[in-house]
């Protein structure tokens, strides 16, 4: 995924009201960014560090700038925009990067499914095999003080994420293939685990999903102000 134009940068001052962040530009101008991340952003907020943002030409938007990436004190790069995870996953599937998800004829986004009024992030289908329902999650929480690069999901209690696991379990029971795909958007994360210390219910449903036959994959993203792309798989530690 290429950014056109390249992402601009500034210095993070503060995040507030959940969806807003103030940034100081090199020329001394202070601007407000839209923060497209509903999580706690635990271990992702570092005032005084560099952030990168995109700019929209849509005149109807209240905030033209969107927070895309952030730097940590040890110069790791984090993808803040959780909405990018779905687009990155779609691109990687179409390019054949995610080997476990090749061999399908059609890819659809945001298709209604399940029993709880849900929409699947990605649906793969073919005339010769069972459909594959894929829920995409962005993983950015690096374990504090970790030397092994262990990442966790979620970074806050997620009732919505719990619902998605129940839906995936249901699809397996209906004879379909179901996949939970973690898109790792933190350059310091080398493995992914369910965050039992944050959301016990999610962790328990995660185990139930594995037992039911839901597949869990994790892939790392290479990021820069010019482009982001999924490159390699990493372990899921349960």
From Swiss-Prot:
Gene3D superfamilies: 2.40.50.580, 3.40.1350.60. InterPro entries: SfsA, SfsA_C, SfsA_N. One of its GO terms (molecular function) is DNA binding. Coiled coil: none annotated. Belongs to the SfsA family. This is Sugar fermentation stimulation protein homolog. It comes from Shewanella denitrificans (strain OS217 / ATCC BAA-1090 / DSM 15013). The gene is sfsA.
């Amino acid at each position: 995924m290429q950014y056109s134009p390249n992402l601009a940068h500034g210095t993070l001052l503060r995040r507030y009201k959940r969806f807003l962040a103030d940034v100081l530009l090199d020329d001394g101008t202070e601007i407000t960014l839209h923060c497209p991340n509903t999580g706690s952003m635990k271990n992702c907020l570092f005032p005084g560090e560099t952030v990168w943002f995109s700019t929209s030409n849509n005149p109807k938007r209240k905030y033209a700038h969107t927070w895309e990436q952030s730097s940590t004190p040890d110069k790791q790069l984090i993808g803040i925009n959780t909405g990018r995870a779905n687009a990155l996953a779609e691109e990687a599937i179409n390019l054949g990067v995610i080997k476990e998800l090749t061999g399908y004829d059609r890819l659809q986004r945001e298709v209604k499914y399940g029993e709880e009024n849900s929409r699947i992030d990605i649906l793969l289908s073919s005339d010769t095999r069972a459909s594959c329902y894929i829920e995409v999650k962005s993983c950015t929480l690096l374990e504090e003080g970790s030397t092994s690069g262990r990442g966790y999901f979620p970074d806050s209690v997620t009732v919505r994420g719990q619902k998605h696991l129940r839906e995936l379990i249901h699809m397996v029971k209906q004879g379909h293939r179901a996949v939970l795909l973690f898109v790792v958007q933190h350059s310091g994360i080398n493995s992914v685990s369910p965050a039992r210390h944050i959301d016990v219910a999610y962790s328990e449903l995660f185990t139930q999903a594995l037992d039911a036959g839901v597949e869990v994959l994790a892939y790392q993203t290479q990021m820069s102000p010019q482009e982001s792309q999924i490159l390699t798989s990493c372990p899921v530690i349960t």
